[in-house]
């Protein structure tokens, strides 16, 4: 049976000397693994079109088990992501998070729309790091946890101007007048907590303007990665590469 589906490549694995296995997240929100024969041979015409982040119309045959890719009508190669190692790494963090948030046979149209949205925003020049924060925030509940950013979890005060950090002891933001109760709380500005709350709750189709200072994005990114580590025991391969890049920059 020949199948045609739009999708985005979220994973690639080399298979033997010349083949590879790709996984696309298709337009219906399903993960589809495909064998690509002779993918690493330039003459096959599939080498460039089966890279990570490629968005296109995938034509493949499938009877039982894994399908076999026949051709790709590329809509957007997202080539710019391969020109900047930081953008590529943060985009990889987006795909890795979405991939791991879904069961192998699960279907999530929202996941496809989220990935399509963030890759489009990165292409428009929006910070790839910021987009990774958006993905991590939107996927939290799929990993079995959530985070409270909009009020003090100790006093229940909703005065966000008084928030000074995130407490893993009390599982949420804390305000300055009770900060002494957790001296190990993760310190960050109330503006960062406010923006985390907005990005967590705001539907992606309402995120028209996304301009946040780099320092605040760094704070947000550091906290959400820590949240995944503490609450879900999650370690991301992409984040490991990002950390290595920053260490090299600081040598």
Curated annotation (Swiss-Prot):
Keywords: DNA damage, DNA recombination, DNA repair. It comes from the Bacteria. Transmembrane segments: none annotated. InterPro entries: ARFGAP/RecO, DNA_rep/recomb_RecO_N, NA-bd_OB-fold, RecO. Gene3D superfamilies: Nucleic acid-binding proteins (2.40.50.140). One of its GO terms (cellular component) is bacterial nucleoid. GO terms for biological process: DNA recombination; double-strand break repair. Involved in DNA repair and RecF pathway recombination. Belongs to the RecO family. This is DNA repair protein RecO. It comes from Staphylococcus saprophyticus subsp. saprophyticus (strain ATCC 15305 / DSM 20229 / NCIMB 8711 / NCTC 7292 / S-41). The gene is recO.
